[in-house]
From Swiss-Prot:
Phylogenetic classification of the source organism: Bacteria, Bacillati, Bacillota, Bacilli, Bacillales
Annotated organism of origin: Bacillus cereus (strain ATCC 14579 / DSM 31 / CCUG 7414 / JCM 2152 / NBRC 15305 / NCIMB 9373 / NCTC 2599 / NRRL B-3711)
Protein's pathway: Metabolic intermediate biosynthesis; chorismate biosynthesis; chorismate from D-erythrose 4-phosphate and phosphoenolpyruvate: step 7/7
Single GO term (MF): FMN binding
PROSITE patterns xref list: CHORISMATE_SYNTHASE_1 (PS00787), CHORISMATE_SYNTHASE_2 (PS00788), CHORISMATE_SYNTHASE_3 (PS00789)
Cofactor(s) needed: FMNH2
Protein name from the UniProt record: Chorismate synthase 2
Annotated keywords: Amino-acid biosynthesis, Aromatic amino acid biosynthesis, FAD, Flavoprotein, FMN, Lyase, NADP
UniProt record similarity statement: Belongs to the chorismate synthase family.
One GO BP: aromatic amino acid family biosynthetic process
Described purpose of this protein according to its UniProt entry: This reaction introduces a second double bond into the aromatic ring system.
Amino acid sequence: MRYITAGESHGPQLTVILEGVPAGLTLTAEHINKELLRRQKGHGRGRRMQIETDTVEIVSGVRHGMTLGSPITLIVKNDDFKHWTKVMGAEPISEKESKDMKRTITKPRPGHADLNGAIKYGHRDIRNVLERSSARETTVRVAAGAVAKQILSELGVEIAGHVLEIGGVKAKHISNLSIEEIQTITENSPVRCLDKEVEQEMMNAIDNAKSSGDSIGGIVEVIAEGMPIGVGSYVHYDRKLDAKLAGAIMSINAFKGAEIGVGFEAARQPGSKVHDEILWDEEKGYTRRTNNAGGLEGGMTTGMPIIVRGVMKPIPTLYKPLASVDIDTKEAFQASIERSDSCAVPAAGVVAESVVAWELADALVEQFGKDRMELLKQNIMQHNNYAKEF
C-alpha cells in the first residue's frame, strides 16, 4: 500500500490518495472522523484547532461503506481558507498587489524548513515553504492511519499510544495494561498520559511555556498487539520492518529520534539482560520471556507487542522569537511569528499511532494478500497455525 498527500496549511483543502487498500474493508467517514477529532485534542493546542472542525469526505474507492480495491481519495476542508482566499489563491497576482495582501514572509524561523526550503526551491516568499511544511498536513496522514487501523482491527491487531514525557516531566512506567485500558485512560487525559500523578505537572509545564512565549517537546510511545510472527524480512535493508517504523516516526514534523523496545538503553546493558529468551507451550506456541526487542528482531516481528517511541522537539514557532536574518535585506531580525501551539506532543502521539498503523497494515497486506480482506484473513490464520506448530 502507499499514499500521497496534497494541500497547503491555509489552502482550500487537504487531500490524501490511498492505493492498494484491499477490497472488502468496512470503512465509513465516522471511522476516520473519530481519529481526526483525537488529533485536534490535547492541552497546549493553539487557536487554529478552535477554528478548524476536521471532518473527512470520502470521494472515491468506497461504496456503501465497503472498500472497492481501487484508489481511495479522502479530503478534509480547511475552514480557515475563507480568510486566506486572496493570499492562497491559485490565480496569478498583479505586480500592483501589495506585499501585505500576499502576506509575504522573508524572515525564516530557526528550527523550521523555512530557510532550507526557500533555498532549495528558489522561493523569495517563505510562505511558499511553510504552507506545505506545516504540521497541518498530518491531518490527512491521520486519515490514512484511520484506514490502516481499520485493516488492523479486522485482522486482530490493536494499537494504542500514550505520552511518556513532556518538557522534562516524566511519567512512571505502568505495565500490564491492555490496549483497551491504555485507550480508555489516554482518551480521558488532556495530555494522553497513563500516569495520573504527573498529568497536572505536564499541563503546568505547557502553561508555563505558553506564558513565557516558549514551547516544549516530549516523548510518545506506540504499542501494537496481535502481529503474527515473521512479518517483515531480514533479506534486504529496505524490507526490514523496524527500519520502516523508524522512518515513519522520523517523517513526522518535529520528530528528532526513534527507538524500538528498550532502544538506546540496550547500549548500557550486557547481552544477557537485553536479549529475549524464547519459550514455547502448546497453547501459545513460540513466545518470549521478556520483550526488550519491542516485538522486532532481524527486521521481523517476534509475535510480542510492537513498542515504538518517538522524540518530538519543541515547536520552532515561538512568541518570543529567536534571532534570524531577513533573506531580502540580510539584516538581523527576530524571526516571523505564525499562529502555533505551545506543545503538540499529545496530538503528535495520535499522528505516531497513525504512521505506525500504516506501516504494520502495509506489511501485512504485502506479505499475506493484497486484493481482498477475506483472502488476507485466511492467509494470516493459516500462517499463525503454521508458526505455532513449527
